[in-house]
């Protein structure tokens, strides 16, 4: 049953969209030779392009500069994520998952997505699966279907 939800299924698929939800979950949408897959991250991540960091988990949150209007601060992520989405779609050519559920996705245009499973063991780090059934849940010390 895990094989239907294995992150290795992303190999050869295209990352087509990245967005955040109101509760700060980042949704990575992949499509390709099979139905669309969704990777939802709740933990730290870093996206680099040709060695330069272009997006991180920290960029999700409102900046702490109190001189900046709140509405502008909340739009900051949309500005930062545009640097990434302007490089899409991009084909995934490498997938690595460590025994602690850190996940690394490498794309053909030198784009690299590193997801760090750094939440406490009782909290989900990331979730993966087909678009209509995102059930594979990764914790720092285990993976299971919900």
PLM feature spans:
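Surface-exposed, interaction-prone regions used to assemble/regulate multi-protein complexes
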Residues: 1-146
């Amino acid at each position: 049953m895990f094989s239907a939800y294995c992150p290795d299924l992303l190999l050869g698929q295209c990352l087509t969209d990245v967005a955040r939800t109101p509760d700060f979950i980042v949704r990575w949408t992949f499509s390709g030779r099979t139905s669309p897959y969704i990777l939802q991250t709740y933990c730290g991540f870093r996206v680099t392009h040709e060695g330069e960091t272009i997006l991180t988990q920290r960029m999700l949150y409102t900046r702490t500069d109190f001189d900046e209007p709140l509405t502008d601060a909340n739009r900051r992520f949309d500005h930062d994520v545009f640097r990434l989405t302007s490089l899409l779609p991009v084909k995934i050519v490498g997938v690595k998952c460590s025994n602690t559920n850190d996940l690394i996705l490498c794309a053909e245009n030198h784009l690299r997505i590193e997801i760090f499973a750094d939440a406490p063991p009782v909290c989900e780090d990331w979730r993966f699966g087909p678009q209509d059934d995102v059930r594979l849940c990764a914790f720092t010390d285990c993976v299971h279907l919900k």
